[in-house]
């Protein structure tokens, strides 16, 4: 099973993923924890290029192509092999993030992103948890973590557009995407997620 976790900055994805990973291991499942951009040595180098704020200005086209280069490497070297071995893959962000951030945030044409997905993404998640919180709540949490990366330094209206596209994706693909109110306690969020995962694993 392939599970992705989505949301704007500071919504608690990392906490949920770590908790869910431990719960699934305790239930006897073999779990692979990974992230985007990143997940392989090469893809992590691309991640560094994408997130470092102190570099030359990056065009939106360059940003998008770097993301999909990292994703292609990640899929072929980590996600697809793990799924072929019957493992559960927990991935911090996947293709929905490209729609939300590059189409919503950067306002790139959706068809450009859809085309790359069709060409280079051989597998979509079986289940996606969208952790949703007001932008100001998430950004305050992100600031409390310390130095902000290149995306976290964007303006509030950027993240407002990102959130709107996540909501649109959830409406369009309600069978796959589950919205979770990220202002709830971490314990409650983890229980909701675990309940949905275990129910899906039974079928």
Regions inferred by a protein language model and the residue ranges of each:
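Walker A (P-loop) ATP-phosphate-binding motif of ABC ATPase nucleotide-binding domains
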Residues: 2
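Hydrophobic anchor at the beta1->P-loop junction of P-loop NTPases
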Residues: 5
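Walker A (P-loop) phosphate-binding loop of P-loop NTPases
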Residues: 10
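Conserved lysine of the Walker
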Residues: 13
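Hydrophobic positions on the alpha1 helix immediately C-terminal to the Walker A/P-loop
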Residues: 16
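NTP-dependent small-molecule kinase module
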Residues: 19-21, 136-203
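ATP-dependent small-molecule kinase phosphotransfer cores
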Residues: 29-121
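A glycine- and Lys/Arg-enriched "phosphate-lid" helix/loop adjacent to the NTP-binding pocket
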Residues: 93, 97-164
């Amino acid at each position: 099973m392939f599970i992705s976790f989505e949301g704007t900055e500071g919504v608690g994805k990392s906490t949920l993923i770590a908790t869910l990973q431990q719960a699934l291991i305790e239930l006897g499942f073999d779990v692979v924890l990974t992230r985007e951009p990143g997940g392989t040595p090469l893809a992590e180098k691309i991640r560094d290029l994408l997130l470092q704020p102190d570099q030359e200005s990056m065009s939106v086209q360059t940003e998008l192509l770097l993301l999909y280069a990292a994703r292609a490497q990640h899929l072929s070297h980590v996600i697809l092999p793990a799924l072929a071995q019957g493992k559960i893959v927990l991935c911090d962000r996947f293709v929905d993030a490209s729609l939300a951030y590059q189409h919503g945030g950067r306002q790139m044409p959706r068809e450009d992103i859809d085309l790359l997905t069709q060409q280079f993404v051989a597998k979509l998640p079986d289940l996606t948890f969208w952790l949703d919180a007001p932008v100001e709540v998430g950004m305050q949490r992100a600031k409390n973590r310390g130095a902000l990366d290149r995306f976290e330094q964007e303006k509030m209206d950027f993240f407002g557009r990102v959130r709107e596209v996540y909501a649109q994706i959830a409406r369009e693909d309600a069978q796959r995407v589950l919205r979770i109110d990220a202002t709830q306690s971490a314990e409650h969020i983890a229980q909701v997620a675990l309940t949905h995962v275990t129910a899906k694993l039974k079928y």
